[in-house]
Amino acid sequence: EVYGAGSILVQQDGHGETKIVHPCHGAMVKLLELLGGSTLQARQPDSWEGWYWGAKHTWGTEPLGQGYDQNLTYDITKNTKMLLYWGCDNETTTWGWGGQMPSRLSFWFTDCGITSVAIAPDLNYSAAVHADKWIPVYPNTDLALQFAIAYVWITEDLYDKEYIATHTIGFDWLEYEVMGGANSTPKTPEWAEPLCGVPARTIKALARKWAKEATTTCHCNGGSYIRSCYAHEPARMEVCLLAMQGLGKPGCNFMKFIEWNIYENPNYSPMPRDEAYLTGWAGYNAAFLDSTDRFIPKTLIPEGIAAKEPITWYGHVICMMPAEDQMEQFQFPLEGEPYLHMIWSDTPCWSTCWNGGNEYLKALRCENLDFVLLQHPWYENDAHFADIVLPVATRFEVEDCAIDNQSGIVNTFLHCEQCVEPVGEAKSDWECVQEVAKKLEKLYGVDDGLYTNLLERYTDGRTVESSIELTFNNSSAQLYTSYEEFKEKGYAMIPHVENWQEDHAGFFDFYSDPDANPLPTPSGKIEIYSTRLADNFPDDEERMPYPHYIAATDRFHEYREDPKAEKYPYLLVSNHPRWRVHANFDDNAWLREIETCKVIGPDGYAYEPVWINPVDATDMGLENGDVVKVVNDRGWTMGGVYITERIKPHVVYQDHGARIDPVIPGESDRAGANNLIAPKETTSANCAGEVTSGFLVGIEKVDVDEIAKQYPEAFSRSFQADEGPDLANWLV
């Protein structure tokens, strides 16, 4: 009432527990809509940045910009000779979507005699198990490698000219760039070698083998390939390479190992097609991914909190929006609306999962921000800066339902029974908001019609049981079994279609007849030169209409050839974590016993591992178990040294997601939360994506006794090596 509804920022996204009735993604949004609205945090396509901002304009695939991969498991088994796991770790980033199926598939492909090649700076957990060959590349330099491959194909006549002529537009622009471009520098393997760290002979061998054998590229999410500076360039360059070898022909496609059937879309599953696709939206008691005019992209939240003048950007940025949406400009605040004064969040993981986390911690202490309300099952990260934390019940403490239609195993609707009573005062997210509604109704409902019957209007009179039944009756499961039978059995399953082997795989229809089966681009073809980008951003020198080589610029200096590298000589790889889901499970005692999960320092503190190549460790005088600072001009965090040949020289590796343990909030951290020192800048000038991997850092050996004397308050906090810092350090 003091500032207006737009003054409340709602943070309502993230990777939470699987809940439909008691969801953890914006249960408060509807309540605030009943009271006039709020400003939403719009989560940009953080797992798909390069694809969304780049490849989507090349092959038009909606909504994420990744390739069609329907029925590809069958096609690969029959036709593919080589799989390129490019920046892909399908042993780590499957998480709740894929379970063990991606791992089993990779073993199956090997058993079928298919060659597997891993391209990544690190010998990750998938490459260590499945790859026949590892090609280590410097982080965020895949673009140089890709251009050099294209150079070999063009100069040695190793690409499909007929396909390029009939299925693409703008190839002459790519050829111009490969053969010299504006700076007259041919993108030869010898040119690429010092940039990407891959020997010229290896580049040539890879290019020739790819041209000779049916090849499919493979991906999961995360890593420097798709979440770094100008990630739209390697993403759309990969599409160009696939096109040069006849994208869609048997064995030549793009496969993704996770998020199958995402958004109930059968184009995005390499597994046998199901008769129906389950949905859980009918009884979903939280926010939906849709467009609104009152929002801020998640990557711009620090700027939005601290704003004193309007800020602008392009697109709603949420992952379900079509490519055309990226051409529309928005601003915060809207004309005549307030700036931010309050945050209500169920997503307290911004600081350790997004770009420029230190900037966010500074913003949380802006004088204009009056109040931060947080609800969450776990006390992590941003919770340190909340005024009130509402304890949320976990999945095991409530009755709910769930859908498994992304694992590729069985399309299943599940009844999730309550396992235990809620601990202490914990309530579900939905119930927490109901309690707020009750209080508001009690305080204001008698005299103000806005608050009258607020609880009833918020819940629509639904109970847990009626919400489950409503969800079931609109899920497609009701076509196969009754609600009563579902409750008795605890699940309902959707069968595969008969003769699923006959389904055309990937881009085969487009390959066979591009005129009859056009792509959703303006021309209907693969647009190596994007007409949409040319029309809407003719002066954008970072994301041009066609792929171009770009490295150090006024915007980014995160490259080894930049003068900044003299001070900060190592490129940091920060992937999705092997032993966590983002920040979740960072306090798991059993996982912390694994040597690549935590490194116990001389002070007994469990530090986040920093993988360092033996060559670099020798140069720095480091040994296993030493404690180091990971530092750049945005601040520093810490880590425990883990010396291994599994990381390329001049590169260091530290997973993202360690729970922050601030030394000086907004400047330094003990726990290894390296997103704090990631660039605050977005993917490029007109692309509000995150840059959270592939940036420059320095490594400094630390004497833990001396640093404890320097920062006595931070280093005197109580902690348990098998859990982390004690909650008593923070809760009042």
Predicted features and spans:
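Glycine-rich phosphate/diphosphate-binding loops that line cofactor/substrate pockets in enzymes
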Residues: E1-L9, T73-L83, S184, K204-C218, ...
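Extended redox/cofactor-interaction regions of prokaryotic respiratory oxidoreductases
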Residues: P23-I119, L143-F147, V239-H384, T394-V398, ...
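Flexible glycine/proline-rich, aromatic-decorated loop/lid segments
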Residues: Y125, N381-H415
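Phosphate/diphosphate-binding loops
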Residues: D370-F371, P377, E417-A437, K629
